[in-house]
Amino acid sequence: MSDEDNNYDDFMLSDDEGMESIEMEEETDDEDKQNIEINEDNSQDDQDRGAARHKQHEQGTFEKHDRVEDICERIFEQGQALKEDERYKEARDLFLKIYYKEEFSSDESIERLMTWKFKSLIEILRLRALQLYFQKNGAQDLVLQILEDTATMSVFLQRIDFQIDGNIFELLSDTFEVLAPKWERVFLFDIEKVDRENMICKIDFQKNFMDQFQWILRKPGKDCKLQNLQRIIRKKIFIAVVWYQRLTMGNVFTPEISSQIEILVKDNECSSFEENNDLESVSMLLQYYILEYMNTARINNRRLFKKCIDFFEMLISKSLTFSQESGLMVILYTSKIVFILDSDSENDLSFALMRYYDRKEELKNMFLYILKHLEEMGKLRERDITSLFHKFILSGFIFTSMILEAISTDKINPFGFEQVKIALGSPIVNVLEDVYRCFAQLELRQLNASISLIPELSVVLSGIIQDIYYLAQTLKLWRKIARLYSCISISDIISMLQISDDNEMTRDDLLTILMRSIMKNRSVVYFKLDLTSDLVYFGDENKVMLPRCSKEEFRLMISPKDEETTEKARLIDFEYVNDVAIYNNPTRIRTKSSKEFFNTLRKSRETVKLPRVSNQSNEDTFLPSYMKFSNKYLELCKLASNNLE
């Protein structure tokens, strides 16, 4: 190719390249404009996207909260599954994850999260309860861990001020029942054979556990659920304090406990005794009073004790479950027995109106019911019968059976009952067998010696023991002495009926037995007293009128034609013959009570109709005229009347 062609080509190429460069420049300018426009569009888009992202962030926050609640629910269910598998440590770790979850700013979400945290803490405490009551060794470390968890729960409740789940009070109440359960198989008045060391540890834990919630008692408010929770806390603290002092110090009759009892039973404007207390609290009050009687043979606050018995019996009667719990029935029957025994010592009028043997029958049945319930509880083993309470129940049953058997035609040996057979061979039953034999044979001094072998019962069963002595003396008087002697001095009878040298029988005691036997128509043999010579005559041959002028002899002095003796009799005649029952029926003591006897005398005195006196001239003459020293007797009457004036 020639140079011109080459130059042309170069020229054309250069032109093309120039054109391309020009076009490139034009395109660059266009691109700059487009970039500016694009940047402006992008900035607007960025703003829109930022707003959208902010909106999505806010929406994502609530979605995240929803997811947290779902997560808490899943973790909670997993923890409960592990709990059912008895994998307590792993379950506790899962519940702790819920408790330590982050709290967000949304009020609604916080409330939901707080609810889950509260439920997780409740489950942690209940897990600990299962570990505590099933773990044999190393329980002390576990107790400290539970108290730490309890402190966490207490602080959490103070922080949220109960402003969460409406069931918070019920959940707390249930938790208190789990960690501070009822003591149904041990009694405050029967702790001789309990494992004290183990029980003190449990009671001490319950006391420290409930102390963590004392602040709730100071929280004001009239919410029924809050007041119910406060009542439960107050009750649990009272029970723990009483048990702790009983096990450690032995004495529960302190000002501290007395003040707590006053708070527990006091009626106020918000609630009554029945509303403030339930079966558990009244059960503890009854045990407290039973223990008081066991120590002193006396109940100081009888009114409150009776109120507790009635309320306790009413609660049990309304529930078939409660009526089948042997522990509760033992407390109920023991309370009733103690109240009757204390009433006898106090001469309670309400019990004075009750027939004596009916009351003894009631006591015997209740003693037997207690023995049956103790048998069901497995507490009639020989090792248990050494306690004061078991001796009290066994002896009470045997003693009341002896009293009733003495007047009954059906002779049922109390040692034949299955509940007594279980204890045969124990020292207390051997002593009771000797007591029963001596009573049956009316060996009074040996009877006293046998009863003296159980001195711990001489106070709590003093009333029944004195009844046994009195009944034994009465039976010996009528079954042995009266049938053997026709005449015997009072002093000789007293020596035969002597129980012991320390418990001497007096002359008045013997006369009381004789007079009561007449009034109750229990004198087997007719007897007559000669109090001038202190002699007692036994036998029907002594049925002779004591006055020299019997009513038959007085009637013989009246002529057959004088039929209207009452009309013609003078006042002094009437007073004389009335003493020998000529015109009026005599007032008899037999078959009458003391009250009936004196009422009859009063009625005779007030309603007597005096005869008309026709002749007043011989009023100073004492009739019948043949009576010796009648004039002297009249002088004595006048002298007495003058002195009375």
Curated annotation (Swiss-Prot):
Keywords, ordered alphabetically: Cytoplasm, Nucleus, Signalosome
Record field: transmembrane: none
The PCI domain, residue ranges: 348-543
Keyword Transit peptide attached: no
Main location: cytoplasm
Region called Disordered, residue ranges: 1-63
Ranges of Acidic residues composition bias in the record: 1-45
PROSITE patterns the UniProt entry points to: PCI (PS50250)
One CC-aspect GO term: COP9 signalosome
Biased composition (Basic and acidic residues): 46-63
Entry superkingdom: Eukaryota
GO biological process: adaptation of signaling pathway by response to pheromone involved in conjugation with cellular fusion; cellular response to pheromone; conjugation with cellular fusion; protein deneddylation; regulation of protein neddylation
Localization (cell): Cytoplasm; Nucleus
Keyword Lyase tagged: no
Function: Component of the COP9 signalosome (CSN) complex that acts as an regulator of the ubiquitin (Ubl) conjugation pathway by mediating the deneddylation of the cullin subunit of SCF-type E3 ubiquitin-protein ligase complexes. The CSN complex is involved in the regulation of the mating pheromone response.
Subunit architecture: Component of a COP9 signalosome-like (CSN) complex, composed of at least RRI1/CSN5, CSN9, RRI2/CSN10, PCI8/CSN11, CSN12 and CSI1. In the complex, it probably interacts directly with CSN12.
Extra facts: Present with 1320 molecules/cell in log phase SD medium.
Protein name: COP9 signalosome complex subunit 10
Species classification: Eukaryota, Fungi, Dikarya, Ascomycota, Saccharomycotina
